[in-house]
């Protein structure tokens, strides 16, 4: 899956600007909690510019909704790497989440590629209303052991 929003955001910054890749993607949830894909009206993106390595943050609505904010320069986040593609979209990640015994709703959903030895794909991180954090491989669909927090 390629993020089409990257092209739109780069176009907002001027001619010739391209982004190296996605650094993170965090869901905005209706009323702070979600059960399904329709409960996500948009996303906060952090992307890295190809030429200078500068990072930008912006919001983009989830289609069929429209709209996005102008990208603003931010400090690049530490501990994550840029990536261009992934196979498991957020709808499929939500379906995988519902197959687990971690509650029926979630309060956070994010996608990023942790810069850590042995991590070879980006991951979806979904925090359930029961306090369980589900980690799903964004290429493999593999579920890591859920992490329970109090």
Regions found by a protein language model. Name each.
Residues 1-150:
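Long, terminal "pre-/pro-" and other extracytoplasmic accessory regions
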């Amino acid at each position: 899956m390629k993020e089409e929003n990257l092209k739109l955001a780069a176009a907002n910054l001027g001619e010739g600007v391209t982004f190296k890749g996605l650094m993170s993607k965090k869901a905005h949830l209706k009323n702070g909690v979600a059960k399904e894909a329709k409960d996500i009206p948009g996303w906060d993106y952090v992307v890295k510019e190809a030429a200078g390595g500068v990072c930008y943050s912006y919001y983009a609505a989830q289609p069929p909704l429209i709209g996005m904010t102008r990208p603003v320069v931010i400090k690049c986040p530490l501990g994550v790497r840029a990536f261009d593609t992934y196979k498991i979209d957020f709808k499929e990640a939500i379906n995988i989440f519902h197959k687990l015994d971690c509650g029926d709703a979630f309060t956070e959903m994010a996608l990023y590629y942790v810069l850590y030895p042995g991590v070879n794909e980006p991951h979806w991180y979904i925090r359930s209303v029961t306090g369980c954090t589900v980690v799903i491989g964004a290429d493999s669909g593999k579920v890591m052991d859920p992490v329970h927090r109090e």
